[in-house]
Amino acid sequence: MSNSWNTRVEIASDVETLRDLTRDAFGRQFEVDFLDAHRAEPKAWLPGSMFVATGPDDRPVAYALLTRCHVGDVPILSLGPVAALPAYQRQGAGGAAVRAALAAARERTEPAVVVLGHDTYYPRFGFRQATEFGIHHPQYDGPHLMALALGDAAVPAGTLTYPVVLTES
């Protein structure tokens, strides 16, 4: 597989493909429901914020999603889900989508991005534990909650809130 991926913003015809990709990548429905809930919530969903890495046929094989969240009253971005089809995992497709998403976040002049994810994966993109920035989540302040400062703006400190919250049953 290639180490050089084409990336782009999702297009309307990608939506069902990305739902299927999510189910295949995570092996369950919860993350698909999470994705659908974000699409349905205008306080979370940012048009043009789903970045895909594509295969040779321009079909998405991985993606990274940016949505709106807040630290206190300050809007920042949340990264996730990030997913790749099993056949494309560990081949750089997901990382390419993450890099495209973070580049777009910098262009938007956002102050920061948070992610709840693998603490051995996201530091390669510059993420550090969110508590180092004074960002706290009411239910979780562990090593998997990370933040990335974008640009020169101060990273807001305070309580992290999301407009969409789903709990696993």
Name these PLM-found stretches.
Residues 1-37, 44-61, 152-169:
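Short amphipathic alpha-helix that is part of the acyltransferase structural core
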Residues 48, 141-145:
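Short hydrophobic/aromatic beta-strand or adjacent loop that forms the aromatic wall/cage
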Residues 50-52, 59-69, 75-83:
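Conserved beta-strand in the GNAT
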Residues 88, 92-100, 110:
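Conserved acetyl-CoA pyrophosphate-binding loop and the N-cap/start of the following alpha-helix
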Residues 104:
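Short alpha-helical functional segments enriched in proximate histidine and acidic residues
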Residues 107-111, 116-141:
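Conserved active-site alpha-helix within GNAT-family acetyltransferase domains
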